[in-house]
């Protein structure tokens, strides 16, 4: 059984399809309630009016992830505001590759940097040496968090949600 919909749809709907298929509806709803309770407890502790960007870095360069994806939905529930460019990706999971000259379009109060493999890590390490990167206000403020690209840009579900919430809590509150 495969849920109908795409990566921009509500992740909870797909989660419920899997719970139904496994005849674990009650357990599935309990897991969603746990996520909601964790969000409700975390949200008031986070800084108000904070903008965030989720940037996936690969060997070709950075892409801004849509604010409508799974992670964007969670960040929105936490009261964190998506960067303007992330809001403009209505029908796509991410922007085109951003040049270093356009990297400022991905700036926010906090940037979560996701990489998928060692080649992406190498490209990110090289970018960190570029003036366009070091001038980002998030970088200047030390508000840069490296996160798992598989979870932050390619996953959804209960375990992924818990990891995203762990990462946000670690970055913004510690």
Enumerate the predicted regions with their spans.
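Extracytoplasmic substrate-binding proteins
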Residues: 1-59, 151-174
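Ligand-binding pocket segment of bilobal, Venus flytrap-like solute-binding proteins
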Residues: 44-46, 93-116
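Short, conserved beta-strand edge motifs with alternating hydrophobic and charged residues
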Residues: 51-57, 85-86, 113-114
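Short, well-ordered secondary-structure micro-motifs
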Residues: 63-68, 123-124
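Alpha-helical, coiled-coil/dimerization segments enriched in small aliphatic residues
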Residues: 66-96, 151
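Structured C-terminal subdomain patch of bacterial secreted/periplasmic proteins
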Residues: 106-174
């Amino acid at each position: 059984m495969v849920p109908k919909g795409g990566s921009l749809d509500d992740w909870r709907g797909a989660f419920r399809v899997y719970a139904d298929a496994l005849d674990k509806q009650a357990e599935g709803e309990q897991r969603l309630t746990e996520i909601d309770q964790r969000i409700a407890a975390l949200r008031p502790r986070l800084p108000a009016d904070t903008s965030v960007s989720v940037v996936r870095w690969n060997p070709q360069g950075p892409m801004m992830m849509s604010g409508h994806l799974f992670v964007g939905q969670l960040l929105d529930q936490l009261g964190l505001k998506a960067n303007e460019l992330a809001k403009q990706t209505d029908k796509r999971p991410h922007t085109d590759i951003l040049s270093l000259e356009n990297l400022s379009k991905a700036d926010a109060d906090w940037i979560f940097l996701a990489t998928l493999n060692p080649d992406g890590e190498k490209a990110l390490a090289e970018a960190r040496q570029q003036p366009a990167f070091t001038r980002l206000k998030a970088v200047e403020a030390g508000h840069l968090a490296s996160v798992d690209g598989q979870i932050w840009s390619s996953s959804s579900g209960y375990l992924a949600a818990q990891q995203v919430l762990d990462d946000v809590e670690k970055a913004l509150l510690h």
